[in-house]
């Protein structure tokens, strides 16, 4: 059964979902119907520690659904260190795909913050897009949050 928990943070409401002990999604926004679990409370604690600058890397079991290439891209994103960025082109070159495809896969990321698609920017240094509620402004806020820690 899917468990759901929404909670407020200094960067907005976050809703997390899990099946058993695997994280299904992290999204921005609030969901009315909730049925939390001890695992979701652990996830919430890690997210709050990340937002406060006390956690640089998450340690959670993720339930990731997608093609092999999508999973490779999301895995590569998790290797980008806290406070650092990579370009869509750098990731595309490493995985032998196109920067546009990397951007599309970032837009399909259902584990925002945990799989840090906000750390991927354009080659010219501009931010590109962000699928989270709040869009590019939230992406900029997340990057600034990490750089200021």
Residues of each region from the PLM?
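Basic nucleic-acid-binding alpha-helical/helix-turn surface characteristic of O6-alkylguanine DNA
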Residues: 1-100, 145-149
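Generic, ordered loop/turn and secondary-structure boundary motif
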Residues: 59-65, 121-122, 128-131
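The DNA-recognition helices of helix-turn-helix-type DNA-binding domains
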Residues: 109
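…primarily DNA-binding HTH/wHTH and HhH modules…
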Residues: 126-149
């Amino acid at each position: 059964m899917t468990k759901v928990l929404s909670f407020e943070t200094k960067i907005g409401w976050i809703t997390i979902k899990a099946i058993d002990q695997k994280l299904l999604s992290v999204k921005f926004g609030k969901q009315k119907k909730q049925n939390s679990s001890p695992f979701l409370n652990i996830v919430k604690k890690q997210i709050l520690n990340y937002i406060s600058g006390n956690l640089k890397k998450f340690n959670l079991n993720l339930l990731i659904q997608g093609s092999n290439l999508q999973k490779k891209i999301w895995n590569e994103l998790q290797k980008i260190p806290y406070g650092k960025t990579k370009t869509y082109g750098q990731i595309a070159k490493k995985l032998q795909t196109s920067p546009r495809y990397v951007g599309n896969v970032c837009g399909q990321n259902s584990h925002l913050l945990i799989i840090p698609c906000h750390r991927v920017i354009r080659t010219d240094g501009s931010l590109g897009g962000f699928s989270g509620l709040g869009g590019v402004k939230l992406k900029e806020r997340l990057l600034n949050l990490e750089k200021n820690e």
